Amino acid sequence: RSSDLFGSLVKQYHLKQTADRADWLIGEGLLAEGINGKGLRSMSEPGTAYDDPLLGKDPQPAHMKDFIKTREDNGGVHLNSGIPNRAFYLAATAIGGYAWEKAGYAWYDTVCDRNLAQDADFDAFAKLTIAHGEKRSGSDVGAAIKQAWEQVGVL
């Protein structure tokens, strides 16, 4: 989810954290006392944010092989967001440094791109992030982004 990604970047910027120092958690501290979990979602390890008898287990997949096909949640847009979230985490940590400086710009440029269709699938989105990463930051960044999407099974 773009909101997860950009929220995480704002937090990292505020804390002056490099990609390898960030916790990559969304909603940490929001779970009630006694709930077994560290947050609502994990960008680094989707599906591991919580596992509790009351809440159940974090359902987010980290790889396309576990993609959830459903009519609920607008086709699983929130459930399956663990896949692109993990791709961003992998790209940002592979590139190194501050995630907002290179990987973040590639994703930002992608969501601002008029060529990004409203109903774009992960494949189309991934290809645009690679192109924007290369355009703004060079072929090494584009290659790291491509490898991240390959690692989560999108490409």
Where in the sequence are the language-model features?
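Zinc-dependent metallohydrolase catalytic domains
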Residues: 1-155
